[in-house]
Swiss-Prot record:
This is Large ribosomal subunit protein uL2. It comes from the Bacteria. Residues 252-276 have a biased composition (Basic residues). It comes from Aster yellows witches'-broom phytoplasma (strain AYWB). It holds the Pfam family Ribosomal_L2. SMART domains: Ribosomal_L2, Ribosomal_L2_C. Part of the 50S ribosomal subunit. Forms a bridge to the 30S subunit in the 70S ribosome. PANTHER family: LARGE RIBOSOMAL SUBUNIT PROTEIN UL2M (PTHR13691:SF5), RIBOSOMAL PROTEIN L2 (PTHR13691). One of the primary rRNA binding proteins. Required for association of the 30S and 50S subunits to form the 70S ribosome, for tRNA binding and peptide bond formation. It has been suggested to have peptidyltransferase activity; this is somewhat controversial. Makes several contacts with the 16S rRNA in the 70S ribosome. One of its GO terms (biological process) is cytoplasmic translation. Keywords: Ribonucleoprotein, Ribosomal protein, RNA-binding, rRNA-binding.
Amino acid sequence: MAIKKYKPTTNGCRNMSVSAFSEITTQTPERSLLVSHKDQAGRNNQGKITVRHRGGGVKRKYRLIDFKRNKDNIVGKVATIEYDPNRSANIALIHYVDGEKRYILAPKGLTVGMQIVSGKETDIKVANCLPLMNIPVGTTVHNIELKPGKGGQIARSAGSSCQIISREDKYVLLRLQSGEVRKVLATCRATIGEIGNESYKLINYGKAGKKRFLGIRPTVRGSAMNPNDHPHGGGEGRAPIGRKSPMTPWGKKARGVKTRDRKKASNALIIRRRKK
């Protein structure tokens, strides 16, 4: 994916860049695969904020994505490559020979007219989906299941992928982009290739307004707040935080503290922790 850079004709355009959308083949999504989606603005079912700095943004319809890839041994043809406002990756509309249409995540190298298929004995080609036990060691994969039949949960964002490094009994060892090495059941499915739109991380939004379009609200420093709002707040002028170490808004130590539950069951499947 190419990046389009703007000339600094205004302060908002200075250093701003956007996707050139050179891979996109249509701007009209498949209506049968669209559903309404209400923005939760970072709230849970009790109305409490669980994710800060969320809210507003433009309205958008949700595209139903086939993460399970369970339509076995039926050939599908890539009809379009489309933009999805709900994720960083592009999506591809697949027309299957039996008449069904589905969206999948668009991997790097997938083009209109290519044929894809899912199944246990599928060829090792980009966008084909099959169990990890049937994929050769060293292959790059994405959209990987953690539980058989649940659908892909790992490596779904733009430019992401994992590499199969070995097999052990009923498990396959994967190296994630973070550097983590973990076991996954060999019966879990994965899709061949790397997610496309890999230049997404190079986009510079240029101004706060573009982040607001995405539903991202401002992040206020704790030291700029009052003492009843944040442990760093209060004081005269630019006062220090007054603590031995930085704190979260809820008074717990921040930075360098491990937050993963030591009793989490999946800890036994992680061979090497991710790089810091």
